[in-house]
């Protein structure tokens, strides 16, 4: 299957649960920069971030093979919200591990989607190690933040943007682990 076909299939999966996010021109930025400026408002999605697209696609791919009873991931926020949201939609228990001092609003959102939140470690790496050990000990399905099925789901935002505004000459994306840039 071509990459475009993969994105179109992922879009069908994603749109079964959420609506496309808007892309809006920003005239004030345009006047300051001297060029057309479009912003893709992923903040309008249920979790407030593009990563929910990846979670929905990932869980759809799991459903096509064998849906686990429980999943786990380590995060500092948006990946955990994505997994919690998609797991709840799939009827799967989610365990999300975050470090001490994590953003309390992100923690509340993760719990709000029904996930079990564990606060372990002083930084993300320690949380990751704890989550990995717990996954092995309790036979939990590990949801990595960089899995191909997540990245393809995330890529549906670019499909929307390029379909709506096909003559873009530059695209700027935020980069954390890079799933938004890869998608």
Place the predicted regions along the sequence by residue.
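PLP-dependent amino-acid enzyme catalytic core
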Residues: 1-183
């Amino acid at each position: 299957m071509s990459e475009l076909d993969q994105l179109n299939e992922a879009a069908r999966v994603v749109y079964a649960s959420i609506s496309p996010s808007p892309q809006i021109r920003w005239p004030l930025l345009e006047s300051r920069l001297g060029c057309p400026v479009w912003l893709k408002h992923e903040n309008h999605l249920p979790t407030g971030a593009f990563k929910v697209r990846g979670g929905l696609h990932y869980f759809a791919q799991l459903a096509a093979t064998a849906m686990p009873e429980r999943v786990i991931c380590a995060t500092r926020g948006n990946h955990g919200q994505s997994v919690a949201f998609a797991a709840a939609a799939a009827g799967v228990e989610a365990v999300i591990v975050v470090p001490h001092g994590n953003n309390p609003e992100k923690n509340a959102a993760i719990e709000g989607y029904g996930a079990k939140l564990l606060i372990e470690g002083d930084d993300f790496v320690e949380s990751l190690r704890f989550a990995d050990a717990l996954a092995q000990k309790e036979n939990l399905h590990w949801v990595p933040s960089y899995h191909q099925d997540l990245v393809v789901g995330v890529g549906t935002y670019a499909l929307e943007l390029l379909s709506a505004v096909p003559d873009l000459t530059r695209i700027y994306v935020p980069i954390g682990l890079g799933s938004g840039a890869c998608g």
